[in-house]
Amino acid sequence: MRLISKKKIEEFGQKLREKKIDLALFLTSEPIHDVNIEYFTGFQQTRYYSFSCLLLTKKNTTLIVSPISYDRALKEAEADEIINLEKYDRSLIKVLREKLKKVKTVGILEEIFPSRFYRKFKKIKFQDINDIILEIRSIKEPKEIERIKKACGIANHGIKVIKENLSKKITDKELGLILEQELIRKGADELSFPTIITSGKRSVFIHPYPSFLNKKLQPGLGLVDFGVRYKGYCSDITVPFTLGKITEKQKKIVQTVQEAYETTIDNLKIDVPTWKVHESVENLIKKNGFELKHGLGHGLGLELHDLPSITSKPKYKEQLKEWKEVKLKKNMVFTIEPGIYVPGIGGCRLENDILMDRKPKSLTSSRLINF
């Protein structure tokens, strides 16, 4: 069953009409997983080895599935029509030739849409609707918020696990395995991304590879960045920690990150542009002699990175052409994650998940752990 209301689907249909788009087409196949099929029909699939296609017009929804998914789709999906691909000789092109006969303009997600369809349907105009779909999904409905809260609750349990197991004797891999096992035991369906554990000099890497090394945690600054999926919806938090005695420079990094986080929370208000939130905190970090090297936060939902994106206003003309200001709205869910990374000294990032209301509500409770 889908979590969103009929009103949300009607809102999407209205936006398609405004753009003079006849139909939206979403596709999940082995190299592509489009969460919008789940969003509009409630039909959940594994992120691997799956197939489904959704045709959505202002009047109805048609879900096309493989033979192995058909019986389950009949029970679980909400759609006006559910088609077994077997009836069309397992050819999606055959189905689309029938369904798109009178269609002139089709809305797609350009970044992930297979190029072969352009060649097969040359008379149809394909138009990117990524901005429309991100805007629609950015405002969460009550049932979506319930699932995100559950994912965040599991992440909060993870904080407790980290506190209980953090030591100079444990390896990053051992800590990661203990954490991940507990997250699954607590109810997570899967991780929302590979867990990152860094310490010592390696903590300066924002996205290290591999995400841990199977080495003992090093003295100084460190962090654990992790999240889970619960029935499709994501959480994402970073728990910063210190091991042993830290230097004055490291103390200043930690204090500045904490101040930046608290300032950000104070700045979160309805209708405030996200770039202004980022700019204010970026200036604070600069005044303390450091640099904010990444966005201050990102939306959460069926995707790990959803709208809103809490980043700086683009500086270059080409980027500004495609840029659109986004303002904070009630029932947006997003991360706040100020971080500072100084080569040779260490890195610190504090990240929590926030539900926007009249005042921001923190759904997770990450804070610095001193060991």
Residue spans for each PLM region:
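Active-site neighborhoods and metal-handling regions in enzymes and metal-associated proteins
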Residues: M1-F371
